[in-house]
Amino acid sequence: GSNGEDGKVQATFDLMGIRYTGTDYLSSAISMSKELAKKVLVPEGIPMPKGLTLHKGHKAEYVPFPCVVKPCCGGSSVGVSIAHNEKEFEAALADAFSYEDTVLVEEYIDGREFSVAVLDGKALPVIEIEPLEGFYDYKNKYKAGSTKETCPADIPDDVASQMQFWAEKCCQSAGVTTYARVDELLDRNGNI
C-alpha cells in the first residue's frame, strides 16, 4: 500500500543512507501504480488487460461490460469492483474514487487467477488462487478459509513455464530485484 510499497519509504531510506530489503524506490513506484506499470510493461510485450485510466471529474466515452474498476495505486484489492452494467459501473467508480483521484477501468477477464513469486530474478512454482465465492477481493484475501490456494497449480507444464517467464519479464522490465509477486490470469481460451 501507500508509503511501504509505493517507493516512498525506500526513497527516504536511500536519502538517509539506511539499508533495507527489497527492491529500490523507482521499481516499487512502477509496480504500485497500475497506470505506470502498464506504460512500462505493455511496450515490453507483456500481456495485460485492455483498459483506460480515468481521473476524478472525467467520464469514459465507452465502457464494455463487464469491466473491472480499481484505484490506480491501491493494494490488496481495496476498492476493486466488477461492473456488469451502467448502474454498477457508476457505483464502482464512486467507490474507487473514494480511495484516490485516478482509477483504472479494465476489460473483465473470465478465467482462473494465479500468482507467481519471483526470488532473485527466478520464478518459483505457480500458485492457483480460487476464492470459494466471488472474486479475489480484500475479504477473500484476508479471511481465513475463504480461498483455496494450490501449489503447484494444476495446469500444463508449458502454461506454468509461460507464466513463470512473464513473471520474470515483469520484474526485469520494471527493475524489480530481490523478491516480488506477479498476479496472472488464464482466460477460458488458454491465454495468459
What role is predicted for each listed range?
Residues 1-32, 47-50:
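A short, GP-enriched loop/loop-strand-helix hinge that lies immediately N-terminal to
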Residues 21, 49-50, 124, 136, ...:
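A short, local hydrophobic-aromatic micro-motif
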Residues 28-112, 164:
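Active-site nucleotide/adenylate-binding loops and adjacent lid/helix of ATP-dependent enzymes
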Residues 77, 132, 192:
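Glycine-rich phosphate/pyrophosphate-binding beta-alpha loops
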Residues 84-165, 186:
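Phosphate-binding site of ATP-dependent enzymes
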Residues 107, 118, 171-192:
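Conserved metal-phosphate-binding beta-hairpin within the catalytic cores
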